[in-house]
Amino acid sequence: MRLDRLTNKFQLALADAQSLALGHDNQFIEPLHLMSALLNQEGGSIRPLLTSAGINAGQLRTAIDQALSRLPQVEGTGGDVQPSSELVRVLNLCDKLAQKRGDNFISSELFVLAALESRGTLTDLLKSAGATTANITQAIEQMRGGESVNDQGAEDQRQALKKYTVDLTERAEQGKLDPVIGRDEEIRRTIQVLQRRTKNNPVLIGEPGVGKTAIVEGLAQRIINGEVPEGLKGRRVLALDMGALVAGAKYRGEFEERLKGVLNDLAKQEGNVILFIDELHTMVGAGKADGAMDAGNMLKPALARGELHCVGATTLDEYRQYIEKDAALERRFQKVFVAEPSVEDTIAILRGLKERYELHHHVQITDPAIVAAATLSHRYIADRQLPDKAIDLIDEAASSIRMQIDSKPEELDRLDRRIIQLKLEQQALMKESDEASKKRLDMLNEELDDKERQYSELEEEWKAEKASLSGTQTIKAELEQAKIAIEQARRVGDLARMSELQYGKIPELEKQLEAATQSEGKTMRLLRNKVTDAEIAEVLARWTGIPVSRMLEGEREKLLRMEQELHSRVIGQNEAVEAVSNAIRRSRAGLSDPNRPIGSFLFLGPTGVGKTELCKALANFMFDSDDAMVRIDMSEFMEKHSVSRLVGAPPGYVGYEEGGYLTEAVRRRPYSVILLDEVEKAHPDVFNILLQVLDDGRLTDGQGRTVDFRNTVVIMTSNLGSDLIQERFGELDYGRMKEMVLGVVSQNFRPEFINRIDEVVVFHPLGEQHIASIAQIQLQRLYKRLEERGYEIHISDEALKLLSANGYDPVYGARPLKRAIQQQIENPLAQQILSGELVPGKVIRLEANDDRIVAVQ
């Protein structure tokens, strides 16, 4: 008999049998070796065949292993093994059986039949396991489905549905799928398309995270519960596992062979199976090589004839990119659009999923947490869809609470560290013999005993709280199982079991759960097991950097004293500081318009009066860092073509993938201060882009993504009208001067731009009285730098007056002051430090000497 007439699986099993004989030091390859190899073969036909015939494959394997251990062993054969006469006889019988059946190749299941018709140890073992020629023949017919073996890979294609699909209806029966709430319209539309005679293939299209896969799971659950039309009752929903289908397909045509096997198996089911292909676009081009047919083209004939009931799911972009290009494939599918659910629908979905997440995380999820997750995620996470982003918030908040339950409470941890510290000190003091050390040791022992007592009490309490939590968890798990059992009993019509569960077990468990929850609520001191809206806000703040959590007392006071904080850096300019402070307070109190930026301001005034400094102070106040603002120098955007740098290059241009300078910065930090410095120097087209930002708090970048500016403070600075401010300052009141400056501004900016700004703030020129305060602030920075090098410095009032007089220029504001400090203080100090006149550790005094400032120690 030619070995190349065996199927691939049979050839592999024969090679494994040879290895087995070598390993056992047997001289001959017996039918037992081959049967053992076939039973252990991954993805082979023998185990499913025996199971189908009602034979316990595990027991048979044990019996064969025992028989193998009794075979005679020969040493010193030098690895020479050959088939025994018995094996040759059985293989010849296989050949004969294959010819009778009209097979071109000999498949491995015929070996079991041939072994039964032969005689020997294997025959006896098979018969004692319950195998007969009749039941094995019947199982073979069932497995083959009336087909003959015409190619070597025939066995690989068998049970393709089992290998390459996941049965969603089976998972729904076992209660492993999450409940699907709402989405009735989409599920009804899907069923409607599936009921058609031809082209009965719906494709679910929607943004990522809106619940396309959940709709198919909902369909599977409805089929199980019998809540579908007659035409769909008893159908199975199988999800195609593309990963398994492609994995390991090494040779050309192997992928197509597997897919063909799946399609053949589906054809045999005669419409009793609905195939679900998640990420449908992956089928287009899958397995495509030079001249080969891709998966999409292989599906077309079956889809068009209505033989294959297929439900696809893909996103809008990928549908357009892959499926719309192939018009022949597109027309075979019927589109079902899945829109993002509203906040109200999302709350209903979350309430339905609540129990599953409570069971998984062993925590309690409150209703305010669910409402907060839906509303906050809708408002603050712009680039993702509901319900996915809301579910993620709940999941992560529950996970963080669970982590706190599992880890040691902070109070215990602090005590533990203190005990370790005291023990180390105790060890050190025990080595000392002086009186002071002994006295300290006695005190330390007392403290140590006290801390250890506290620790053990707290630990007991912690363990008790953990135990009570796990108690409620066990009851919840039992209740969940009882609910699944009642559903299964309802499907099969077991009324006795249903009544036992409904009126006996479930009410009893609910009573136990209520009692356990009440006792739990009384005792909790160290552990929190509830997810509230505060935890949701905390997680959201961690994701986006937007402070949406409830304000602590300290933060409220800080916001009420905001003007004082800003005035510590920005001298004068009361109107500007007040306008900015009010905008931030409105935002944190939740009163600002949710569809516009927190605040948008145009700062006008002469150079050096604190316009940019106020932005830095604001960023520092909000984020504790001057760098936490997006600063864009508008003088860089003077040409028309440079506008695209803000939002990103359009498609087809170099740099398209990189995104825009402004949009990318805000996408990364949605909560920030945006400073557009020297705004009048920018090209007029830049203002057209800013119109959407100021009005709707949004901007579309070069790649079509919408960037959310609703949590930003937009500040623009300009020098327009500064000559008027300089000339008329002191002559006119603030209101009159502001009107005049706005007249100049309206000549440079369009009315629709000025109209969208919350407030135009005119900065005053600085007076001599302001310069002294600014000098103090500037000097503080110098003191800090010197302090790091070990120098302490003080300035006399006369020296400060002299410095202010030298640094004051009504035209240039406070900037000349910086130069004055540099020339009159920093330069002489640097020389004196380098020459060694000034030494670290001693106080340096800055005194006025005529029109100079001198440093003395």
Curated annotation (Swiss-Prot):
The Clp repeat (R) domain probably functions as a substrate-discriminating domain, recruiting aggregated proteins to the ClpB hexamer and/or stabilizing bound proteins. The NBD2 domain is responsible for oligomerization, whereas the NBD1 domain stabilizes the hexamer probably in an ATP-dependent manner. The movement of the coiled-coil domain is essential for ClpB ability to rescue proteins from an aggregated state, probably by pulling apart large aggregated proteins, which are bound between the coiled-coils motifs of adjacent ClpB subunits in the functional hexamer. GO terms for cellular component: cytoplasm. Residues 555-765 are annotated as: NBD2. ATP 1 binds at G206, E207, P208, G209, V210, G211, K212, T213. It comes from Salmonella typhimurium (strain LT2 / SGSC1412 / ATCC 700720). UMPylation of the chaperone by YdiU negatively regulates its activity, facilitating Salmonella survival under ATP-limited conditions. InterPro entries: AAA+_ATPase (IPR003593), ATPase_AAA_core (IPR003959), Chaperonin_ClpB (IPR017730), Clp_ATPase_C (IPR019489), Clp_N_dom_sf (IPR036628), Clp_R_dom (IPR004176), ClpA/B (IPR001270), ClpA/B_CS1 (IPR018368). UMPylated on a tyrosine residue by YdiU under ATP-limited conditions. CDD domains: AAA, RecA-like_ClpB_Hsp104-like. This is Chaperone protein ClpB. It holds the Pfam family AAA_2. Part of a stress-induced multi-chaperone system, it is involved in the recovery of the cell from heat-induced damage, in cooperation with DnaK, DnaJ and GrpE. Acts before DnaK, in the processing of protein aggregates. Protein binding stimulates the ATPase activity; ATP hydrolysis unfolds the denatured protein aggregates, which probably helps expose new hydrophobic binding sites on the surface of ClpB-bound aggregates, contributing to the solubilization and refolding of denatured protein aggregates by DnaK. The lineage of its organism: Bacteria, Pseudomonadati, Pseudomonadota, Gammaproteobacteria, Enterobacterales. Residues 391-525 form a coiled coil.
